[in-house]
Amino acid sequence: TERRTYLYITVSHKTAYDMASKYGFNQEQREYLDELLSDENNSLWSSVLYGTSGEDNQIVAVALSQVGNVGGRPYWSWYGFNSRVEWCACFVSWCANECGYIETGIIPKYASCVNGVQWFKDRGQWLDGSAEPLPGMIIFYDWDKQGQSGQQDGRADHTGIVWKVENGYVYTIEGNLSDKCTTSRRQIGEYQILGYGVPEY
């Protein structure tokens, strides 16, 4: 006689809002999710499915899920630091790692903004700060803070992830902005924007 064993698996559909509940999104994060899933962003989600160099919403979604974190411990400790450091680059690297982009060489693991810029420039994946970016690009800033980080010197001081571009403004998600994960908005071409790393998603 022949004996057969059958394994039955039930696969159930989970919506984005199901997952938002599972991961404990707060009200602000849910509002960002609503905006990401609005009809006006359909073309952006198509690019995630079919691929567009430099544009990606997976890393944007991961970054948005972290909005509200204070102190950056998950990011700088993941990087390997035993105590707090300036953690904006650790945050970008952590988000990239969550998407598998460090392992695949799409985005570097970097704790120094200067090193992040150089990685993209070495590969010809760099846009000047006057350019109009796409979601998922990596933004770098050269702050003009006399008496603090000093005047602009052409070297990156801060980094984040481009969320969207709308009505002449670039919206970003950044870590270590006043020691928090938060969103920011600046005019395209604003003089403190050094440029953009363009990952080959």
Question: What is each PLM-predicted segment?
Answer:
Residues 24, 31-104:
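N-terminal capping segments
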Residues 31, 54-61, 114-118, 131, ...:
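Generic alpha-helical secondary structure signal
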Residues 102-179:
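...with weaker cross-activation on analogous glycine-rich loops/strands in unrelated enzymes
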Residues 166-201:
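Active-site signature of cysteine proteases
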